[in-house]
Regions:
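Structured C-terminal cap/extension of enzyme domains
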Residues: 474-534, 539, 545
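Positively charged, lysine/arginine-rich intrinsically disordered segments
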Residues: 7, 22-24, 34, 540-545
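Alpha-amylase-like alpha-glycosidases and glucanotransferases acting on alpha-linked glucans and related
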Residues: 40-48, 55, 61, 98-190, ...
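Active-site pocket-lining segments that scaffold enzyme catalytic pockets across diverse folds
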Residues: 188-202, 206
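Catalytic domains of carbohydrate-active enzymes, especially glycoside hydrolases
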Residues: 71-93, 287-288
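Mature N-terminal, pre-catalytic/accessory segment of carbohydrate-active enzymes
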Residues: 22-24, 29-58, 62-70, 82
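Asparagine/serine/threonine-enriched low-complexity, disordered tracts
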Residues: 6, 13-16
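Gly/Pro-rich turn-and-neighbor structural signature
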Residues: 208-212
Length: 545
């Protein structure tokens, strides 16, 4: 695995000569608006299709990590060759760490993804292009934040910490060049992203992006909207609660995310918070085709973990659930952006019936994880025979789970293995023990990933996504939750995995294409289904949710 070390280019850090340093009215929670009642609009739904989950940083690259350059275009050609219709990526926000989920702005693209090859090909930009930049399109809070981001914002001078206007004006004047630099970097990112997306869409492929539920404390979002978060507003401005999840009923352990909690239930800020989310979703949907909202369960109730104001240590023994105004929130979203928003929701974790009721009320597309389908009985909603059309099914749980091969050889229980074997064997005598003369378990140690892919593609879920590591039968996972990369450690680091083109053999390409065509996932993706038809389709399995 390559370490996450990016080349030093003119755009990854400021040049040495730069000094360091109207509200909408929303419907109250309750029945859907009369406008939506009168018009049963088509709900955007993925047609029967398949694709690959691969973050941009995992593309091959001579520069340390993958970027928006030639290798990304080559990957699109591979998707076309194998009849794939979907490319799912992880968040592409600017971060100060390898994790794509630790963004310093929910509105700024990541400068590490800028392609040096394309900069060379384009000769950067002309003076005319620079003059014509519409600066209002770029996130000014992010530019202001970055120019002073040598320390966490709660340690800045009081006037900047609380965003007093005279202090902001002074900084803008004193650090004009540095702020303009960050605006310039965002311009370059936007141009390269537009070029790639046009190629993707011209190739009849859709991009799915992940949008985290929470944002980092040390971010432009929290700094510029601190009143919308549960912070110590009287003194330190540090979080009084952080987000996380307890252990659920499946194989997943609890987590502490150390991200501040939105002040969802404060009547004085709720409308502004909704507006911020609307702008965030609108921005993302202008750059990708579908959004997968992480931790959808948090819109029913969010798990709050108290923290010590002085030490900032989380206290999980006193953590608890707090109701979230999710219905009101999604009503505001649909009234502002339309009822046909292309959203996929991660309806996983410690789920209650209310989660599925909220999802289905707004006709949102859910998620199914095949790796979680064999630890329970036949009513397990993650078992492939229980998938519904309006869902996207994955081989594994994206970035936080072991790869299929690692799960099978290192983590799966005997019960899970036996249940999987019973699930796939044909009903003929002797088949349980032998396949082509080999013992079945030994056979599966070698071919488990292809069995998973075939079962996934056979399912009723309209979307089927393969994690790239699973396609390559790899043991290397993307991330281990609750751990951080260690630069002193010479082994695989979180978020550092990259594939090589030599791994995508002719056999893999042919087999993937054949399975895609065999199970009808190479057809058109621009299908819609009315909410009435969807109710009929899902009715037979809705009780499982």
């Amino acid at each position: 695995s390559a370490k996450l070390t990016k080349h030093v280019s003119p755009l990854t850090k400021p040049p040495n000569n730069i000094s360091p340093s109207k509200k909408r009215r929303h419907s109250p929670e309750g029945p859907i608006s009369s406008r939506l009642k009168r018009n049963i609009k088509p709900v955007i739904q993925l047609g029967r299709s398949s694709g690959i989950l691969l973050h941009i940083t995992s593309l091959p690259s001579p520069y340390g990590i993958g970027d928006l350059g030639p290798e990304a275009f080559k990957f699109i050609d591979f998707l076309v060759e194998t009849k794939q219709k979907l490319w799912q990526i992880l968040p592409i926000y600017q971060t100060n760490s390898p994790s794509p989920y630790s963004g310093v702005s929910a509105f700024a693209g990541h400068s590490w993804l800028i392609s040096p090859d394309k900069l060379l090909d384009n000769g950067l930009i002309s003076k005319d292009d620079l003059i014509s930049i519409d600066r209002s399109r770029f996130n000014q809070s992010y530019a202001n934040f970055q120019q002073y981001n040598d320390s966490i914002w709660s340690e800045w001078p009081e006037s900047l910490r609380r965003r007093e206007q005279y202090a902001l004006k002074t900084i803008r004047e004193l650090e004009r060049d540095r702020i303009e630099y960050y605006v310039f970097v965002q311009y370059i990112f936007d141009q390269q992203w537009k070029d790639l997306r046009k190629y993707v869409n011209d190739s009849k492929i859709k991009i799915i992006d992940d949008i985290p539920m929470y944002v980092d404390y040390d971010s432009a979002d929290v700094w510029s909207n601190s009143y919308m978060f549960r912070l110590d507003h009287n003194d330190t401005m540090k979080p009084t609660f952080v987000a996380g999840v307890p252990s659920d009923q499946g194989p997943n352990k609890g987590q502490i995310w150390n991200m501040p909690i939105y002040d969802w239930n404060n009547d004085n800020v709720r409308k502004d918070l909704f507006d911020w989310w609307i702008k965030r979703l609108h921005k993302k949907l202008s750059t990708v085709d579908f959004l997968r909202i992480d931790h959808f369960r948090g819109l029913i109730a969010h798990y709050v973990i108290p923290v010590d104001i002085i030490t900032q240590e989380p206290n999980t023994t006193e953590a608890y659930w707090v109701k979230t105004p999710g219905h009101e929130f999604l009503t505001a979203i649909t009234e502002s952006l339309g009822s046909h928003i292309p959203i996929i929701v991660e309806d996983l974790g410690d789920l209650k019936p209310e989660v599925f009721e909220l999802r289905d009320h707004f006709h949102l597309c859910g998620v199914r994880i095949l790796q979680m389908g064999f630890y329970s009985d036949s009513t397990n909603i993650y078992a492939p025979h229980n998938y519904i059309p309006n869902s996207v099914a994955y081989t594994g749980r994206a970035h936080d789970n072991p790869t299929i091969l690692q799960w099978w050889t290192e983590e799966a229980s005997d019960k899970e293995k036996h249940q999987f074997i019973d699930y796939i064997r044909r009903p003929v005598e002797g088949d349980k023990e032998l396949i082509n003369g080999l013992e079945l378990e030994k056979h599966l140690d070698k071919h488990i990933c292809w069995y998973f892919i075939q079962i996934l593609f056979q399912s009723a879920a309209n979307g089927a996504i393969i994690q790239m590591q699973d396609l390559l039968n790899s043991l290397t996972r993307m991330n281990i939750p609750g751990t951080e990369s260690d630069i002193e450690y010479d082994g695989p680091q979180n978020w550092s995995w990259r594939f090589e083109w030599s791994e995508l053999t002719f056999d893999i390409r042919i087999r993937l294409k054949e399975l895609t065509q065999m199970y009808g996932r190479d057809l058109t993706y621009d299908k819609t289904i009315s909410s009435e038809d969807m109710a009929l389709k899902n009715d037979s399995t809705s009780s499982l949710d």
